[in-house]
């Protein structure tokens, strides 16, 4: 089996991740719910994970890191916690439904939403931002990189625009956290939402957000906190304010191990290897008859993704053949990014997405490219 669906979830993790989860299953209690060793050990796991992520993102304090089940939950928490009826938001057509659907629901409640388009290479049209600006514009919400094309967002340019106009700068880092260096202080990011199970190399069911210390986010959930139990209102201090209920300590133990491994290896080093693998694949398939590649493969930074179609063949059929005949795992279809597909003209066909990990080998990439070329020849001869 050749696994090239890492933008959906990374299958291959460092062995330390599994070891940490198994150890936590047998040793961790419920953090903040007692003074015995199992609960204290759980609290140490949670703190260690905050510290690791704060180091990775260059956050000023570990209390800026809050945990959730995934990036979707983190985005819902942040967007619903800072936007109100009458506010205006600028976002992009590159966004995942984890951004779009919360914004659509907020739009039904009186929040106005404007979308930035893309050019022929699926690059953001940054110049549109100035034309979309309103007196009531409250936030700029962007993805770090498209989960369809891999095209990255120029976060420095986005930050400059947001800061010049006094906007909140919110980033969906589902595809970039752990895959690209991110310095939230240097960029002046107000909220960075991430998932644990992709490039951060943790297990599914983990994720969260960096929230700028002075930013107040109204909690999406309230309830048990382990502190101030006689208060009717949920505690306001961070990170407790945004972490109602028992945390996924076992998952966080694995996430911490994954992040620590990333820090040891160096995100820049791993990103360079992934970029080289994506480039190797692209160079071998881009001239194959009938193959169309989407996105700007020359731009940097970008996610290690190559999205393509073969003639007019349904992307799902291509993915099925790649798995059944070649043992290659890829993702086909809409990728939960409907506006991106409208911009690309691939609403009906979808695209076949190959996404690479530093755990992949050159041989695997070459085999996948050869399979695409062979399949393209077969389809064109049908």
Each predicted region: which residue ranges?
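Pyridoxal 5′-phosphate
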Residues: 1-382
């Amino acid at each position: 089996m050749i696994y090239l669906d890492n933008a959906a979830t990374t299958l291959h993790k460092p062995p330390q991740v599994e070891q940490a989860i198994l150890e936590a299953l047998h040793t961790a209690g419920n953090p903040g719910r007692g003074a015995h060793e199992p609960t204290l050990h759980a609290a140490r796991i949670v703190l260690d994970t905050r510290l690791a992520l704060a180091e990775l993102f260059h956050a000023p304090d570990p209390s800026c890191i809050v945990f959730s089940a995934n990036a979707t939950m983190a985005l819902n928490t942040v967007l619903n916690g800072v936007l109100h009826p009458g506010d205006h938001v600028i976002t992009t057509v590159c966004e995942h439904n984890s951004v779009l659907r919360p914004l659509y629901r907020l739009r039904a409640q009186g929040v106005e939403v404007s979308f930035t388009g893309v050019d022929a290479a699926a690059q953001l049209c940054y110049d549109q931002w100035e034309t979309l600006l309103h007196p009531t514009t409250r936030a700029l919400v962007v993805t770090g990189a498209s989960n369809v094309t891999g095209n990255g967002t120029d976060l420095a340019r986005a930050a400059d625009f947001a800061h010049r106009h006094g906007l909140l700068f919110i980033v969906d880092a589902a595809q970039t956290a752990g895959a690209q260096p991110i310095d939230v202080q240097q960029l002046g990011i107000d909220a960075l939402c991430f998932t644990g199970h992709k490039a951060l190399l943790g297990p599914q069911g983990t994720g969260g957000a960096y929230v700028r210390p002075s930013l107040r986010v109204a909690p999406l959930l309230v309830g048990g906190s382990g502190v101030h139990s006689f208060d009717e209102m949920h505690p306001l201090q961070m990170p407790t304010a945004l972490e109602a209920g028992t945390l996924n300590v076992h998952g966080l133990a694995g996430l911490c191990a994954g992040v620590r491994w990333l820090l040891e290896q160096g995100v820049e080093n791993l990103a360079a290897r992934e970029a080289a693998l994506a480039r190797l694949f692209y160079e071998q398939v881009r001239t194959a008859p009938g193959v169309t590649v989407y996105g700007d493969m020359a731009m940097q930074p970008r996610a290690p993704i190559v999205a393509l179609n073969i003639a007019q063949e349904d992307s799902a059929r291509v993915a099925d053949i790649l798995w059944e005949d070649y043992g290659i795992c890829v993702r086909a279809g809409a990728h939960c990014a409907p506006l991106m597909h409208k911009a690309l003209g691939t609403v009906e066909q979808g695209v076949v997405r190959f996404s690479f990990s530093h755990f992949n080998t050159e041989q695997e990439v070459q085999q996948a490219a050869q399979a695409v070329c062979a399949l393209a020849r077969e389809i064109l001869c049908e």
